[in-house]
Amino acid sequence: MVISVATPRRSIRDAVLGGVLGAGGRQLYQPLRCAFYDGAAGGGLTAALSEDGAEGGVPLPCGRKTAAAKNVLILMSDTGGGHRASAEALRDAFRLEFGDAYQVFVRDLGKEYGGWPLNDMERSYKFMIRHVRLWKVAFHGTSPRWVHGMYLAALAYFYANEVVAGIMRYNPDIIISVHPLMQHIPLWVLKWQSLHPKVPFVTVITDLNTCHPTWFHHGVTRCYCPSAEVAKRALLRGLEPSQIRVYGLPIRPSFCRAVLDKDELRKELDMDPDLPAVLLMGGGEGMGPVEETATALSDELYDRRRRRPVGQIVVICGRNQVLRSTLQSSRWNVPVKIRGFEKQMEKWMGACDCIITKAGPGTIAEALIRGLPIILNDFIPGQEVGNVPYVVDNGAGVFSKDPREAARQVARWFTTHTNELRRYSLNALKLAQPEAVFDIVKDIHKLQQQPATVTRIPYSLTSSFSYSI
């Protein structure tokens, strides 16, 4: 006689830790071996919340929906400005494409619901990128699967209940991650709660070429890659071709569909209407050799023989108030505009003829859409290294860490090498993908309309939920 015995359900913390660490982390990224179907009744959100709520104090969901609206939860972290920018671009695209059909919430799950180090990632990241050797060690040191797998499993053990609370607060119909550390723990939680694939989970990668391995998780419904190079990395990391889409980097809709006239923009921004303009940036934090490059540009863009400028400069200092104050107190040979943190970059880019910037993916993608030839003057080790060949090899710009040489290149483009400037501009436009953000939200909309289907789950996860008697 066969007797069925109901085994008590372990807590989410024990299940995650046991499943991931039970084999010393060896099965963390094994090939997907089993299928999971979520179409049957039973379990699901209510049951999961009632069980874990009694144990871990997880509140009932309070995300309210209108009669027809679907909730979209976008997970991000302010480790650099690109993740939030992509999240807000997706939010705006949902609103433009589908109106009130979706309610979109952009949340930093680690900061709002996690403890240390999740709630301290922004400060830690800013510290490390100011000490680039430290960041380089952190980036490459956590690349092996067993290293970041153990690290994320430990975080899941301590903060799983908090993550459950954060996710269920918004009662999401779709979850989007735009950060490499926002896949693993939420996916573990969803699978434990029997909500995946009923709740589609998609990743939107915000690095153009060089990606940290934590971007790639086998359990996602879809992985949106900004370039063919990233798609190749996704395949090498074990994702199936059916999970991968290559649409480009999501950029604010104001960049994608606004038709801006350069002459009108220069009039609006109080710029010289006749002089070519170079845009100098250092990212949201005003990093890199911005001051040195601005000084060199002031010298190189002044024709001493004719005693007149051959170009003008726009400097975006971001949140770096010290840099802005220093530049405002300097004397210049040519017209200069010095700005702080800008929310209307599409206007400043539309008014300029080329750009000098560090190799941030968002700035590169925006410059390509505007057809701006790019001079890359710096990069963050790790995720931005591959952005340099992405620009240079595609003929959209050049790389020079020397501020004086970068300034000379601009002077040549504005005087004797104008044909070269036009060629780089055309190549930039060819590389641009202005509709990427709309293509992504349209594809997510199609996913949401599909019924729950069979999805494959890593063996390590399913094995942790199985008990032999």
From Swiss-Prot:
Keyword Glycosyltransferase tagged: yes
PANTHER family for the chain: MONOGALACTOSYLDIACYLGLYCEROL SYNTHASE (PTHR43025), MONOGALACTOSYLDIACYLGLYCEROL SYNTHASE 2, CHLOROPLASTIC-RELATED (PTHR43025:SF8)
Gene Ontology CC: chloroplast membrane
Functional summary from the UniProt entry: Involved in the synthesis of the major structural component of photosynthetic membranes.
Protein name: Probable monogalactosyldiacylglycerol synthase 2, chloroplastic
Localization annotation: Plastid, Chloroplast membrane
Top-rank EC class of the record's enzyme: transferase
Gene Ontology terms for molecular function: 1,2-diacylglycerol 3-beta-galactosyltransferase activity
Catalytic activity: a 1,2-diacyl-sn-glycerol + UDP-alpha-D-galactose = a 1,2-diacyl-3-O-(beta-D-galactosyl)-sn-glycerol + UDP + H(+)
A matching Pfam family: MGDG_synth
Major localisation: plastid
Organelle transit peptide: 1-42
Gene responsible for this protein: MGD2
Gene Ontology biological process terms in this record: glycolipid biosynthetic process
Family matches, as InterPro entries: Diacylglyc_glucosyltr_N (IPR009695), Glyco_trans_28_C (IPR007235), Glycosyltransf_28_UgtP (IPR050519)
Native species: Oryza sativa subsp. indica
Family recorded in the similarity comment: Belongs to the glycosyltransferase 28 family.
